[in-house]
């Protein structure tokens, strides 16, 4: 007996309708590509703080158990600061009384060990400048226009900066082994968009020195960047790595194994102001297509991995629904719908334009799990009591997809409904169907959808298991609302909400194919 797993997100009626307005035909015999699971990634400004706390341990355990994530990324690998009362990072560099460097990677190793023992992989950022290496001149800048706070400047001693990165890289080999570290990714900075435009060459030198430092320890380690969010920054950076003069060896260009970029549905600074802006998947699709057009200008980079290693419906991690009611979409079913629709759209771009995204990294972790109140509207994956928000449930649903993507044909062009279909080598299939139009706030669409299958095994029995994420199923936020939206949860209420997210298949049925499959 073959198994078909059907996962529905806000599909109110998915059946064999007499006069369906939307029909999808799934051809099980037509493989269109690999399911690369590029979305299995998350991050936060505060991982070095949260990972070793009970809330972080709980989420890491859940990620391992559900296979919802593979990569984790965070800032402040080299320095520590405090934002909104929460520590970020650690100080790994100091100098003794004689001015000699002293390294302490103990906390970094401790945090990364928590990843590795669960099969998770770090995206390592070598940032920011330790205080002893800061340039004391007035050159450089502070932060960027999205609220990041860092010193955008070159070090006062380039050799010591290089030696720090070499020491960190060698430390990872000593602790985790070369084979493991070869599966990681390395960057030198985060969102350098605030770098003074007349000093971009200093950042290019930062990148060149970083690449030399990491690859001099092991040439197989993967290096890239620049983790920016403005195209006006990305283009000259790519021109440097392709055509510029390398600041280390004087040659042409600099190695880059992956290109990283950030996209959000809207800036957090635009919330609660006119004009009213809603995050839309189309914004991401258009940005990716513009990036594809940009990459055409650099044929030498063809085939280089492209990472969106920060994304979210809205930027800004500390704003809440109390002050910004629009952020309810960070709590409710819109977040997983947005995620699934975005994943499907990026696969469509890969198939149509031959521009695959190798990583899509959601910026959120467990920052709400340490709060007393629940569903406060931050961009996290869990809330108080380590209860998963619907966005985490969306990741867990995507994790049920199989290895090969199969063809899906639709009767008409439509941006509301979509189906992502996959199969495994043994013939099992898993499909996700969604119903989501970003501009229809609170509108429940009643249009029926039909799924037609071809290419199945003739005269065979298929067992269908159905899982739903909607207002009544597997939805912690709607369950919380039905319980009266209590600000604080009792142990019994926590246990009840956790029980909502076990993704049980409540509807099961069998069907037999005809002699044509």
Each language-model region and where it sits:
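Non-catalytic accessory regions flanking glycosidase/transglycosidase catalytic cores in CAZymes
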Residues: 4-6, 15-185, 201-231, 250, ...
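Flexible, active-site-proximal loop/turn residues at the rims of small-molecule/cofactor binding pockets
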Residues: 48, 78, 192, 265, ...
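Flexible glycine/acidic-rich beta-alpha junction loops that bind and position SAM and/or redox cofactors
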Residues: 131-134, 269, 314-318, 367-371
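Noncatalytic carbohydrate-binding groove/subsite architecture in carbohydrate-active enzymes
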Residues: 199-356
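Active-site rim elements
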Residues: 329-333, 377-386
């Amino acid at each position: 007996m073959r198994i078909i797993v059907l996962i529905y997100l806000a599909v109110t009626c998915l059946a064999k309708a007499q006069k369906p307005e939307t029909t999808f035909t799934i051809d099980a015999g037509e493989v269109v590509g690999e399911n690369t699971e590029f979305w299995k990634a998350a991050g936060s400004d505060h991982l070095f703080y949260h990972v070793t706390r009970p809330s972080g341990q709980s989420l890491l355990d859940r990620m391992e158990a559900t296979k919802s994530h593979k990569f984790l990324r965070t800032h402040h690998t080299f320095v520590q600061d405090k934002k909104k009362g929460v520590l970020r990072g650690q100080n790994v560099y100091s100098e003794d009384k004689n001015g000699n460097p002293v390294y302490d990677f103990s906390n970094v190793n401790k945090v990364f060990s928590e990843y590795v023992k669960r099969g998770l992989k770090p995206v390592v950022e070598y940032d920011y400048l330790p205080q002893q290496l800061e340039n004391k001149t007035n050159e450089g800048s502070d932060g960027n226009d999205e609220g990041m706070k860092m010193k955008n400047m070159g070090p006062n001693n380039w050799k010591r900066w290089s030696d720090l990165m070499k020491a960190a890289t060698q430390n990872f080999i000593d602790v985790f082994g070369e084979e493991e570290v070869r599966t990681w990714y390395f960057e030198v900075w985060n969102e350098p968009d605030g770098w003074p435009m007349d000093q971009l060459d200093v950042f290019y030198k930062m990148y060149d020195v970083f690449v030399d430092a990491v690859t001099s320890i092991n040439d197989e380690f993967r290096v890239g960047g620049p983790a920016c969010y403005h195209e006006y920054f990305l283009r000259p950076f790519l021109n440097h790595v392709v055509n510029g003069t390398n600041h280390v060896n004087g040659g042409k260009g600099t190695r880059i194994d992956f290109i990283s970029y950030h996209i959000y549905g809207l800036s957090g600074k635009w919330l609660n102001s006119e004009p009213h802006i809603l995050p839309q998947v189309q914004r991401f699709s258009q940005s990716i297509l513009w990036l594809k057009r940009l990459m055409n200008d650099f044929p030498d980079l063809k085939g280089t991995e492209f990472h969106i290693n920060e994304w979210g419906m809205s930027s800004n991690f500390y704003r809440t629904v109390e002050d910004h009611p629009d952020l309810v979409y960070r709590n409710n079913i819109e977040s997983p719908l947005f995620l699934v629709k975005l994943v499907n759209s990026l696969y469509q771009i890969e198939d149509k334009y031959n521009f695959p995204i190798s990583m899509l990294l959601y910026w959120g972790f467990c920052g709400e799990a340490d709060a007393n109140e629940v569903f406060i509207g931050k961009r996290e994956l869990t809330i108080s009591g380590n209860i998963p928000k619907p966005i985490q449930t969306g990741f867990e649903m995507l994790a049920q997809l199989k290895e090969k993507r199969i063809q899906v044909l639709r009767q008409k062009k439509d941006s509301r409904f979509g189906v992502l279909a996959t199969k495994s080598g043994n013939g099992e299939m898993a499909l996700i169907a969604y119903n989501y139009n970003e501009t229809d706030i609170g509108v429940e669409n009643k249009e029926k959808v039909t799924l037609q299958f071809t290419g199945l095994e003739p005269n065979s029995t298929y067992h269908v298991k159905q899982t739903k994420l909607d207002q009544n199923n597997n939805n912690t936020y709607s369950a919380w609302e039905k319980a009266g939206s209590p600000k604080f949860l009792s142990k019994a209420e926590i246990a009840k909400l956790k029980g909502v997210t076990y993704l049980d298949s409540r509807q099961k049925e069998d069907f037999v194919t005809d002699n044509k499959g």
